[in-house]
């Protein structure tokens, strides 16, 4: 029984990859750099222009592409700065 329990714990750790979390920048436009820990394995940076000028949004994951918005997705820590 102990062997089965130990096996389940090891499989859970391997499947969940508990040893690594991604960090992405999440500041908006020209705000000071801020970092967040993400469950996703990628970061994004969206850039677009509106009546306020050039806008930048950063965060975790990789959202769907939209017209007139430049989107960069990347897969290393803080790669979206």
Curated annotation (Swiss-Prot):
Name of the featured protein: Short neurotoxin 1
Main location: secreted
Organism for this UniProt entry: Cryptophis nigrescens (Eastern small-eyed snake)
Signal peptide range in chain numbering: 1-21
Similarity comment text for this entry: Belongs to the three-finger toxin family. Short-chain subfamily. Type I alpha-neurotoxin sub-subfamily.
Tissue specificity as recorded in UniProt: Expressed by the venom gland.
GO terms assigned for molecular function: acetylcholine receptor inhibitor activity; ion channel regulator activity; toxin activity
Gene Ontology cellular component terms for the protein in this record: extracellular region
Alphabetical UniProt keywords: Acetylcholine receptor inhibiting toxin, Disulfide bond, Ion channel impairing toxin, Neurotoxin, Postsynaptic neurotoxin, Secreted, Signal, Toxin
Disulfide cross-links: 24-43, 38-60, 62-73, 74-79
Cited Pfam families: Toxin_cobra-type
Top-level taxonomy: Eukaryota, Metazoa, Chordata, Craniata, Vertebrata
Function: Binds to muscle nicotinic acetylcholine receptor (nAChR) and inhibit acetylcholine from binding to the receptor, thereby impairing neuromuscular transmission.
Cell compartments where the protein resides: Secreted
